[in-house]
């Protein structure tokens, strides 16, 4: 049975090689367990790190797929993305075979609920001390549904270099 994984995490986080390596490792571990479909929304912060990892792993595991739920408005203008962020975004969208895009105009809460409903696993970057956030709401929904949650914030805090 093919299984699915979603990604939730804070928009602001330290992007380090340690985090990127841990994301790659966890995604590859899930692929070995039969996960083939990965779901992300928004492509900001954590989502972009995870999406890039899926795209890179497609070179080794061409059967996996990234499903993106992107907002209908232009994030480049809204958030004032720098050239690195724009390059990451364009790199992800350039994989025409491995990326499926659905445009989303609903609320973030409804999107997060949809991602949870589609998934069996959740790889997240979630600081439990930040309780009033969209990430905390999404993790609560994932816990309620019984998703296997892999929180890399905890791992990063324990093993960062």
Where are these regions (language model features)?
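Acidic/glycine-enriched connector segments
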Residues: 1-161
């Amino acid at each position: 049975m093919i299984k699915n994984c979603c990604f939730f995490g804070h928009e602001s986080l330290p992007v380090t090689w340690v985090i990127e390596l841990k994301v790659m490792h966890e995604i590859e571990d899930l692929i070995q367990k039969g996960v083939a479909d990965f779901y992300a929304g928004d492509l900001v912060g954590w989502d972009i790190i995870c999406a890039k990892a899926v795209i890179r792993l497609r070179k080794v595991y061409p059967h996996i797929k990234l499903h993106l739920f992107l907002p209908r408005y232009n994030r480049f203008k809204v958030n004032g993305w720098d050239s690195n962020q724009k390059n990451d975004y364009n790199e992800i969208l350039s994989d025409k075979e491995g990326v499926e895009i659905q445009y989303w105009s609903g609320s973030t809460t409804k999107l997060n609920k949809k991602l949870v409903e589609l998934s069996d696993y959740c790889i997240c970057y979630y600081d439990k001390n930040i309780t009033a956030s969209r990430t905390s709401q999404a993790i609560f929904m994932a816990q309620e549904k019984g998703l296997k949650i892999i929180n890399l914030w905890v791992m990063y805090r324990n093993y960062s270099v």
